[in-house]
A protein has these predicted regions:
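Alpha-helical interaction segments
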Residues: 2-4, 12, 43, 61-68, ...
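Short hydrophobic alpha-helical module
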Residues: 16, 39-42
Length: 94
């Protein structure tokens, strides 16, 4: 099974630990992570316009992202065979 979280910072945040860089948008990030975890397919994520779902390119080819706010995004990969996200990370996208 692929690792769930790509970086330690995101894993700590999800486990309830305070992550200084994420405090300004913590509530929004938790909400988006809940939506991501509950999605039965990536098409379900596309159906919510507020997610601003997109397939990424360049050095992030094969990854997808949903929006937390104008600066931060949740990037992840999706397994088609079992329909779940993995290598999830919260990134400063700009």
């Amino acid at each position: 099974m692929p690792q769930k979280y790509k970086d330690k910072r995101t894993a700590r945040f999800v486990s309830g630990e305070r992550v200084k860089e994420f405090q300004a948008f913590a509530r929004q990030a938790y909400k988006r992570l809940e939506i991501l975890e509950a999605a039965p397919t990536k098409e379900a994520l596309m159906a919510l316009p507020s997610n601003h779902f997109e397939a990424l390119g360049g050095d992030r080819k094969g990854q997808y992202s949903i929006c937390i706010n104008s600066q931060w995004r949740i990037c992840f990969e999706w397994t088609e065979t079992k329909n779940y996200p993995f290598n999830i990370e919260i990134v400063n996208y700009h």
